[in-house]
Amino acid sequence: MALWGGRFQGETSALFKLFNDSLPVDYRLFEQDVVGSIAWADAIASVGIITATECSDLKKALNDLLVEVNGDPAIILASGAEDIHSFVESALIAKVGDLGKKLHTGRSRNDQVATDLKLWCQSEGAALLARLQSLHAELLALAEREFDAVMPGYTHLQRAQPVTFGHWCLAYVEMYERDISRLADALTRANTCPLGSGALAGTAYKMDRHALAAALNFASPTLNSLDSVSDRDHVVELCSTASISMMHLSRMAEDLIFFNSGEANFISLSDEVTSGSSLMPQKKNPDALELIRGKTGRVYGSLVGILTTMKALPLAYNKDMQEDKEGLFDVVDSWAICLDMAALVLSGLKVNRPNALLAAQQGYANSTELADYLVSKGMPFREAHHVVGEVVVAAIAKQIPLEEFSLAELKTFAAIIEDDVYPNLTIEACLAKRDVLGGTALPQIQQAIAAKKAR
């Protein structure tokens, strides 16, 4: 039986029931709904709605239901209930009879679902934080293993300056640290309890909402009942945080896909995270990374979906808000598996040092060093930049690297060039000169790794 049937004389159409029912989605809130109901039983007992014995009986029945459903989750969907709240209430009434009908006193599904969803976000958010921290640790370990593996750094996907693979790893370590901070911050803001807000105006029973919030491990109760039942900022923030993190994961995946390609061949991926072709027997495809990149779009879509759903809703609750869960659940599932998969990819990744070094030695990545050398001899940088551009054009024409020009040839471009130019053009010199906080010099990378490990 529907929880709202008394007002209606006609039958609900089968099509409307299919359209309206949310149990196939919100069944995932079962545990949170039971936990919230147990806390609510204590709350209504505290204001005399039920006796201590009745409260004890309700809580026992709810805990029994929790055990039963955990043993056979199919019970929920087989019930045909409208939503998870209806399922729990109906199952409770089946266990304790009319006593079960008292539980919803002073409570609305509006504050009930808002509470369930915040509890779910807190639980899943904590698990996501752990996954982010695991990925962070895996990437930091890779940075430590390969801190001195030289590779080209890119701008515009063209070789720019030499860096190390450890430096590349640390760039993504920074991104994931921001993701960790962002998620923790979002969970702090979501740590307020809406229960006791009723449908929109607050419950009619003068209970201690601070105690109710504490019973559910929230930091505090919400402060405005209209906002409490209509707020979905925590859903938006979780989807937004996931979207930013997925953007970082996708960028990392794209880099690694390129590094793994035959054109670069800087790294090799484990067989664990690659697949083959049904036609071409030589193929070893980076499917794990491509799927991370592909799943990013669906996470973005869910963020846009919840923002669009919420953008024009009047206060307080509207049925549109039932659409908040499907996208959120998919976001959390997608983000979680992508974090796990990214960590697995990194754990089996091998750097092809000779190929990466060879690529760094090509493409005139030491051009900036020559310009800096000219500056050290007194030439203004803008003039030095122009001179080195001419040197590069000549080197391309001769198909040689800059360091293979004779001193006499280099002097035709700038008479101030001397023999001491050549040590400045080595890969080692290119790296060593970037000995500044955040730079790619090996001591800076080692210090950065040590500092992050010490946290």
From Swiss-Prot:
Sorted UniProt keywords: Amino-acid biosynthesis, Arginine biosynthesis, Cytoplasm, Lyase
Cell compartment(s), UniProt: Cytoplasm
A GO CC annotation given for this chain: cytosol
EC number assigned by the record: 4.3.2.1
InterPro entries, per the entry: Arg_succ_lyase_C, Argininosuccinate_lyase, Fumarase/histidase_N, Fumarate_lyase_CS, Fumarate_lyase_fam, Fumarate_lyase_N, L-Aspartase-like
Biological process annotations from GO: arginine biosynthetic process via ornithine; L-arginine biosynthetic process
Nucleotide-binding keyword on record: no
UniProt-listed Pfam families: ASL_C2, Lyase_1
Source organism, top-level taxon: Bacteria
EC top class, as a word: lyase
Keyword Protease: no
Molecular function in Gene Ontology: argininosuccinate lyase activity
Pathway: Amino-acid biosynthesis; L-arginine biosynthesis; L-arginine from L-ornithine and carbamoyl phosphate: step 3/3
Coiled-coil residues: none
Catalysed reactions, semicolon-separated: 2-(N(omega)-L-arginino)succinate = fumarate + L-arginine
HAMAP family found in the cross-reference section: Arg_succ_lyase
Family to which the UniProt record says this protein belongs: Belongs to the lyase 1 family. Argininosuccinate lyase subfamily.
Name listed for the protein in its UniProt record: Argininosuccinate lyase
